Amino acid sequence: MKKTLLTLLFGCVVTAQAQDIIVMEPSYPPFEMTEEKGEIIGFDVDIANAICKEMNANCTFHSQPFDSLIQSLKQKQFDAAISGMGITEPRKKQVLFSEPYFPSSAAFIAKKDTDFAKVKTIGVQNGTTYQHYLAKEKKEYNVKSYASYQNAILDVQNGRIDAIFGDVPVLAEMARKHEGLDFVGEKINNPNYFGDGLGIATHLKNQVLVDQFNAALKTIKENGEYQKIYDKWMGGK
């Protein structure tokens, strides 16, 4: 895979469109998902495209398991990752983040009419802050980890797990698409685990690119483009 030399592209006057390679885990609707034709779509994709347009950059998207995104950035295999990734202190030691582009909060979904007091086994995506939270703060539960939430949905529907724990908009999309699932228990806001929102991650030494991201994010929030994208993917969530 050809690697973009961002220090050259963004460290001088750009006379042609820069090429950015952005990686994500595309089974996390409404943030990112793969449609029938194989194209990656979603809130994160539209936000990234709007940011890249402001930067006069041509962004391409590649898929990869969530738990390997940070390592790929550290090895400079990709330019950036936007994949519903919370800005947390442990992650900030490994990668550099943009300003938050979305707030972060967590919740549980289960079969409708589930008594949360009887929940014992919880599904969660591997490598996420939600997995870390359950391991440290909810030791009374049995935790089953998944590469993506698709298999977790099947397991909760078939009674192999009692609930799924994750990001509120993602769970809301699951409940919308899968009849019989609904929120249970209380929403959880804990910045010690879930950070100060979701951010775009890059290599630790890529401050120039992060500055470009932040400036473009500020612009799309001010000109109304961010709100249009939010309403498209998050309306009612």
Swiss-Prot record:
<feature type="signal peptide">
    <location>
        <begin position="1"/>
        <end position="18"/>
    </location>
</feature>
<keyword id="KW-0732">Signal</keyword>
<keyword id="KW-0574">Periplasm</keyword>
<comment type="function">
    <text>Binds arginine; part of the arginine periplasmic transport system.</text>
</comment>
<dbReference type="Pfam" id="PF00497">
    <property type="entry name" value="SBP_bac_3"/>
</dbReference>
<dbReference type="GO" id="GO:0016020">
    <property type="term" value="C:membrane"/>
</dbReference>
<comment type="similarity">
    <text>Belongs to the bacterial solute-binding protein 3 family.</text>
</comment>
<dbReference type="InterPro" id="IPR001638">
    <property type="entry name" value="Solute-binding_3/MltF_N"/>
</dbReference>
<keyword id="KW-0813">Transport</keyword>
<dbReference type="InterPro" id="IPR018313">
    <property type="entry name" value="SBP_3_CS"/>
</dbReference>
<dbReference type="InterPro" id="IPR001320">
    <property type="entry name" value="Iontro_rcpt_C"/>
</dbReference>
<protein>
    <recommendedName>
        <fullName>Arginine-binding periplasmic protein</fullName>
    </recommendedName>
</protein>
<dbReference type="GO" id="GO:0006865">
    <property type="term" value="P:amino acid transport"/>
</dbReference>
<dbReference type="GO" id="GO:0042597">
    <property type="term" value="C:periplasmic space"/>
</dbReference>
<keyword id="KW-0029">Amino-acid transport</keyword>
<dbReference type="GO" id="GO:0015276">
    <property type="term" value="F:ligand-gated monoatomic ion channel activity"/>
</dbReference>
